[in-house]
A protein has these predicted regions:
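N-terminal beta-strand motif that seeds the catalytic metal site of vicinal oxygen chelate
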Residues: 1-15, 70-77, 132-140
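Exposed loop/turn and edge beta-strand positions of beta-sandwich/beta-sheet ligand-binding modules
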Residues: 3, 34, 69, 112-115
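Amphipathic alpha-helical segments
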Residues: 13-28
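Short, conserved charged micro-motifs
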Residues: 16, 80-84
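Short secondary-structure junctions
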Residues: 26-32, 93-98
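Conserved short beta-strand elements that form part of the metal-binding/catalytic scaffold
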Residues: 28-64, 121-122, 128-133
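Vicinal oxygen chelate
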Residues: 75, 85-140
Length: 140
């Protein structure tokens, strides 16, 4: 079975986006190209942060620099509150609470079942980030 190991985002400021993911998720920078592209890794999964200025650069057909291709990124985390604090410090935009105001239960801890056990943040360039301690129905 094929396994996901790489994701590529486009950004108007790849360096700033890379700094966000390094601070918020302790990702390591493995390469920075002269054109500004930055490549990160958590030791298992790789992330390329690209900046396409022309149709030829983008390599995605006719959409070029306006290409939209990623809706959100999901991170499995060990401690949701600690990780949420790191995203707050890195400048993330908290889109959902860590505590369910209706039940007082914690989101992302599996108390709602794996299909909804996540907390969402906004990251650089509008990228949506999911975080969960219990994972998702589709993750092993």
């Amino acid at each position: 079975m094929a396994k996901l190991r790489h994701i590529a985002l486009t950004s108007s400021d790849p360096g700033k986006a890379a700094d966000f993911f390094k601070q918020a998720f302790d990702m390591e920078e493995v390469r920075r190209d002269p054109n500004g592209q930055v490549f990160l890794s958590d030791g298992y999964f790789n992330m390329a942060i690209l900046n396409h200025k022309t149709n030829e650069d983008a390599d995605v057909g006719t959409h070029g620099p306006n290409f939209n291709g990623i809706h959100h990124i999901g991170f499995f985390v060990e401690d949701l509150e600690e990780q949420a604090g790191k995203l707050d410090e890195a400048g993330g935009d908290r889109l959902t609470p860590t505590v369910d105001p209706g039940t007082g239960g914690l989101f992302g801890h599996g108390d709602m079942g794996p299909s909804n056990a996540e907390v969402k943040f906004g990251g650089p360039d509008g990228v949506i980030i999911d975080m969960s301690e219990s994972g998702w129905l589709t993750s092993a």
